[in-house]
């Protein structure tokens, strides 16, 4: 299929007689909520947010070099930015393998509104092709998403003015240095 998902959706809605003013460029900012308690608890202001996780059955989407990227960011920026992750409920244990602060709300994964606020207010996001990457694209946050051969960024309508994709045939061969250059 050579048409992006949002273009297909727009066409279906138009065929149903619906107004599609915002279909091609959705804005998910309305889902934000106040996360000042979480920010105060973890004591962070400026931060880079990483989403190194993926569904267990879609490991082809998982880039394996997040810890090296964290090392490069830390070496370049020192303490200017906190490096954060926001694991989903099934990713909390996996977050222990990432050298970043895993944000939780009373020991639980953030809800969708908290996650949206965290993403929207970040300095930068680096994400696998996952739900948080799509939220990032549609709240206007700055960032990168990493795509292997599973699909294209165009097909899933993820690239925006502030959010770009790096597309490679094999995510295992995409170096942390190459990703760091795009930050």
Stretches with model-predicted labels:
Residues 1-183:
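Catalytic machinery of carbohydrate-active enzymes
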């Amino acid at each position: 299929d050579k048409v992006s998902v949002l273009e297909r959706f727009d066409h279906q809605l138009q065929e149903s007689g619906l107004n599609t003013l915002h279909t091609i460029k959705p804005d998910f900012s309305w889902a934000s909520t106040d996360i000042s308690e979480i920010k105060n608890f973890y004591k962070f202001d400026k931060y880079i947010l990483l989403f190194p996780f993926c569904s267990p059955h879609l490991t082809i989407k998982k880039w394996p070099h997040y810890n090296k990227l964290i090392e490069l960011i830390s070496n370049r920026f020192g303490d200017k930015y906190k490096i954060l992750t926001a694991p989903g409920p099934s990713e909390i244990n996996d977050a222990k393998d990432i050298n970043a602060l895993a944000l939780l709300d009373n020991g639980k994964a953030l809800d969708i509104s908290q996650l949206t606020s965290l993403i929207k207010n970040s300095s930068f996001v680096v994400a696998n092709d996952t739900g948080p990457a799509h939220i990032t694209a549609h709240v206007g946050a700055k960032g990168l998403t990493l795509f292997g051969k599973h699909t294209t960024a165009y097909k899933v309508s993820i690239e925006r003015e502030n959010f770009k994709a790096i597309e490679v045939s094999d995510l295992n061969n995409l170096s942390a240095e190459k990703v760091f250059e795009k930050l």
